[in-house]
A protein has these predicted regions:
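Phosphopantetheine-dependent thiolation modules in NRPS/PKS and related acyl-activating systems
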Residues: 2-36, 40-46, 50-81
Length: 81
């Protein structure tokens, strides 16, 4: 089954943080949920790099602090969400 980049992005967030789709919103940010701690953050980064076949720069990893910021960050790597 075809999955859009948005579907893939959402699926990664839901799987890494074990959250429901309705929790993917403007309020979802680093440390706003228990699972998005430093370890969860690096797990998320690794999953995104693997899924989209990219290597995130350190500054992008540090600045990737919200669900929506991540969408903008991936645009730098030609990944349209």
């Amino acid at each position: 089954m075809f999955m859009s980049n948005k579907d893939k992005y959402d699926k990664i967030f839901m799987e890494v943080f074990e959250i429901a789709h309705n929790q993917l919103n403007k309020d979802l940010k680093y440390q706003s949920i228990e699972a998005w701690d430093s370890v969860g953050h690096m797990t998320l980064m690794a999953a995104l790099e693997e899924e989209f076949d990219i290597q995130l720069e350190m500054d992008d990893i540090i600045d990737f602090g919200t669900y929506y910021t991540g969408i903008e960050t991936l645009k730098k790597y030609s990944i349209d969400i």
